[in-house]
Amino acid sequence: MNDAIPRPQAKTRKALTPLLEIRNLTKSYDGQHAVDDVSLTIYKGEIFALLGASGCGKSTLLRMLAGFEQPSAGQIMLDGVDLSQVPPYLRPINMMFQSYALFPHMTVEQNIAFGLKQDKLPKAEIASRVNEMLGLVHMQEFAKRKPHQLSGGQRQRVALARSLAKRPKLLLLDEPMGALDKKLRDRMQLEVVDILERVGVTCVMVTHDQEEAMTMAGRIAIMNRGKFVQIGEPEEIYEHPTTRYSAEFIGSVNVFEGVLKERQEDGLVLDSPGLVHPLKVDADASVVDNVPVHVALRPEKIMLCEEPPANGCNFAVGEVIHIAYLGDLSVYHVRLKSGQMISAQLQNAHRHRKGLPTWGDEVRLCWEVDSCVVLTV
C-alpha cells in the first residue's frame, strides 16, 4: 500500500508530525467486516479524505474515530494516546455532520458557545472564543440570527465554527457539502479549506464525491469493501492509479485488455482485442508474458488526428456515436472497429471551431505511449 506523504504547503517531510495512527482497525457486524484490518497515518495539519461508494466502510471508520462505534479489533492512536476504548465525550475530537445539527431555538452565537458552556469554561473565555469563531467564518453580522434565518452556506459556516470553537486536535467532516447545491458546494469547498488551513486543525473528511475529495484534501484514501484500495495525493491517484477500481472510481477512463506481444527498447507492445492495431506502453510497465493486464487511458489524453501518426503514437479508428457538449469541453463517444466504445475529450477553446467531426463520422484517435497506465489488478 502506498501510504504517501501528503503534499504540504511550505513543509518538508522532516517537519511532518504524525497525529492520528490507525492500526489494523476492524469493525464487524454479524461476522461481516464493514472495515477490514486497515492501517493509516495522518499528519498534523493535514486534510485527509476517505472516498468511496456507499457501503464501502468509510462512514463506519469515521464513526469509530469519533467514538460512536467500538472497534472489533485494532487501535486508534491520537497524539500517542490509545482512544480505542475512550468514550466520545472524552476524546479531543469534534465532528460536523452533513445535516449540521444546529439547535433551531438558539442563535448563531449560542450554537457556537454550546460546547464551551458544556465544558464549563469561564464566561469571558466563551465570549472571546465565540467572537473569534464568528470572525473566522465571517458571520459577525449574523450572530443574533437563528438557523432558519440563514442560507445553506451560512448554516454550514456556523456548524464549522461550533466544531472548531473547542479547539479539537482532530476534526471529522461527514459528507460536509452533501446538503448544498453544486455552485454553492464548489464555492464552499474552497472556503472551508481556507478556514481549516488558517486554524491549522487536522481534518478527516468522508465523501463519495470525487471532485470534493480532490479539491479539499491533500491526500485521499479510496475505500472498497472495507479496505483501502489506494492512498495518495489527488494527482497521483488520478494519473497513476494502482488498480482498475481506483482508475474507474476517479474520473472517466477507457480500459483495454492486453497481453504482451513484443518487448522493444522504447516500449512494450501488447495485443488488445479491443484494438485493430497493437497497443504500445512504457518499457518499464509491469507486464509478464502470457498474463493479461488492463490498460487505463483517460479521455483527455486522446487526440483527434487527421492522418496516421508518424511518431509511434497509438491510434485507433472508429465511428462517432454520440457527442456530449459540456460547455468547456465536448465528450466524443466512439465505437471502434472491434465494437468497443471509448470516449475522448476535446476542449472547446474556440467559440466557432469548424471542421470538427459530428455524429456518424469516421475519426482517427491518437494517444501517446506514456498516456497509458498498465494495471495488473
UniProtKB/Swiss-Prot annotation:
Tell me if RNA-binding is a UniProt keyword of this record.
no
Q: Which SUPFAM superfamilies match?
A: MOP-like, P-loop containing nucleoside triphosphate hydrolases
Q: What is its EC number?
A: 7.6.2.16
Gene3D superfamilies found in the cross-reference section: 2.40.50.100, P-loop containing nucleotide triphosphate hydrolases (3.40.50.300)
Give the EC class as a word. translocase
GO molecular function terms attached to this record: ABC-type putrescine transporter activity; ATP binding; ATP hydrolysis activity
Primary subcellular site in the record, as a coarse category? membrane
List positions binding ATP.
Answer: 52-59
Give the source's domain of life in one word: Bacteria
Q: Tell me which residues make up the ABC transporter domain.
A: 20-250
Write out the annotated subcellular location.
Cell inner membrane
| Keyword annotations of the record | ATP-binding, Cell inner membrane, Cell membrane, Membrane, Nucleotide-binding, Translocase, Transport
Q: How is its activity regulated?
A: Transport is feedback inhibited by intracellular polyamines.
**GO CC aspect terms:** ATP-binding cassette (ABC) transporter complex; ATP-binding cassette (ABC) transporter complex, substrate-binding subunit-containing; membrane
Segments passing through the bilayer: none
The catalytic activity, as recorded, is:
putrescine(out) + ATP + H2O = putrescine(in) + ADP + phosphate + H(+)
What membrane topology is given? Peripheral membrane protein
What GO terms describe the biological role, i.e. biological process, of this protein? putrescine transport
Q: Which family does it belong to?
A: Belongs to the ABC transporter superfamily.
Give the record's subunit note: The complex is composed of two ATP-binding proteins (PotG), two transmembrane proteins (PotH and PotI) and a solute-binding protein (PotF).
Q: What does this protein do?
A: Part of the ABC transporter complex PotFGHI involved in putrescine uptake. Responsible for energy coupling to the transport system. Imports putrescine for maintenance of the optimal concentration of polyamines necessary for cell growth in the presence of glucose.
Protein name stated in the entry: Putrescine transport ATP-binding protein PotG
Gene expressing this chain: potG
